[in-house]
């Protein structure tokens, strides 16, 4: 199973860390996208197997599960930009 997490703020980062520490989805099968590179770098430093990107479409492509961890007012534009 491959998981994409859109957003690496407090919520998205916590979800990514929890999944990466778990055994259900290998960390290498988790991709996190965020517009701020610093948050992605921090996650990658903690869990080197995590995949990170600034491109939401890249993160969502091929994912079996997409977790949206963005502010409510950003949800619609983020979903619209994805070609699902």
Q: Whereabouts are the PLM-identified features?
A:
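NAD(P)+-binding Rossmann beta1-loop-alpha1 motif at the extreme N-terminus of oxidoreductases
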Residues: 1-47, 51-54, 58-61
